[in-house]
Amino acid sequence: MARLQQHYREKIAKDLTEKFGYKSPMQVPRLTKITLNMGVGEAVADKKVLDNAVADLTKIAGQKPVVTKSKKAIAGFKIRENQPIGCMVTLRGVQMYEFLDRFVTIALPRVRDFRGISGRAFDGRGNYNIGVKEQIIFPEIEYDKVDALRGLNISITTTAKTDEEAKALLAGFRFPFKN
């Protein structure tokens, strides 16, 4: 069992039950999945760029990402239908908690000029999105072997019904919110 998973079961679930007054343990919000998405627009011109992005995301997530393809042609972006334009990976279970632990304790403090993450990036249904500008904040990525700095989007999906519940859940996982 992952360290954060154990912390959730022993402490966070009890704290949330006290704070929000849940009647059943199944009402307590929990993490469902974490999705890492890397959009690689340069893949239109050079296929090697996408291979490097897939390799980076594999190192970060610990599992092989799926290549995402365009849904329709957009002439302005020089994209044809079903053309590879990015990659994504969905983490669940132990891998999800391990990634979250590394992200909060190791990767976020390595962000340049870091002052905390925004408390307003919730979607209204208890899910949280955070954008990372550089993939080199993760310790698995070797700085010397990076061909280009690429960002990625991290979507944290929870069972929380409101943003307030989701924020309390993520704060329990020691997310460094600004306010």
UniProtKB/Swiss-Prot annotation:
**What's in the keyword line of the UniProt record?**
Ribonucleoprotein, Ribosomal protein, RNA-binding, rRNA-binding, tRNA-binding
Set out the biological process GO terms recorded for this chain's protein. Answer: translation
* Cellular component terms per the entry's GO annotation: ribonucleoprotein complex; ribosome
Checking Gene3D superfamilies in the record gives: 3.30.1440.10
One Pfam family assigned to this protein is Ribosomal_L5_C
Q: Which residues cross the membrane?
A: none
| UniProt GO molecular function | rRNA binding; structural constituent of ribosome; tRNA binding
* Highest taxon listed in the record's lineage: Bacteria
What is the similarity comment for this entry?
Belongs to the universal ribosomal protein uL5 family.
Oligomeric and partner information: Part of the 50S ribosomal subunit; part of the 5S rRNA/L5/L18/L25 subcomplex. Contacts the 5S rRNA and the P site tRNA. Forms a bridge to the 30S subunit in the 70S ribosome.
What this chain does, per the entry, is described as: This is one of the proteins that bind and probably mediate the attachment of the 5S RNA into the large ribosomal subunit, where it forms part of the central protuberance. In the 70S ribosome it contacts protein S13 of the 30S subunit (bridge B1b), connecting the 2 subunits; this bridge is implicated in subunit movement. Contacts the P site tRNA; the 5S rRNA and some of its associated proteins might help stabilize positioning of ribosome-bound tRNAs.
**NCBIfam families on file:** PRK00010.1
Could you tell me what this protein is called?
A: Large ribosomal subunit protein uL5
Native organism is Variovorax paradoxus (strain S110)
Q: Which gene encodes it?
A: rplE
